[in-house]
Amino acid sequence: MRFARSILLAMFAIVTSATLARAEGSCIEMREWGVRAGGGINPSSQIQYYAIHPYVGLSLWKSASRWSDQYGIRALWMIEPWVAYVNDDHGPQKTDSFEIGLNLLFIRLVFGDWVVRPFVEAGEGAVYTDLRKQDLGTRLQFTSTIGGGLEYEIQPGMSVGLQARFRHMSNAGMASSNPGINTVFGLVGLTFR
């Protein structure tokens, strides 16, 4: 049921965004891009993740961008693919594996126009993993992610950022086994505008 609701919500968001953008005569434009690297751990099983996350930040439709800009908030729709090495040396069956994922429904809010700026990010994505030991039910998993951090403007148009994220990964009920894995991440990266 959660899977069906997520699909319907995603379709509604895409159709609504496209309709509003077309009505305003606007097009989506890239406002920033960047790359992040870091690691994470599942506190209960000690599974470790080491990942690289490139991303692009696209403008929202004009009225949403205008509203957020008015309050000193840069609101972006992020598309973030990632690849990760996964190490599980703490269980009875030691495993090395990988993840390949894509966060498509992701929002990034950057507050203020100072040299040091706070930001928050949240969204949904999908991941393919070969992590077999955890009996995840399927290799295709869905992710819910939330995080925040600070970015420091090194020079105009370029910032370095430090952030923390929490991610829940599960198969959304597509299989009888659906234990899910929660991960706490730390990431450092560069952002270009």
Q: Where do the model's predicted regions map?
A:
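Transmembrane beta-barrel strands of outer-membrane/channel proteins
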Residues: 33-41, 77-85, 120-126, 162-168, ...
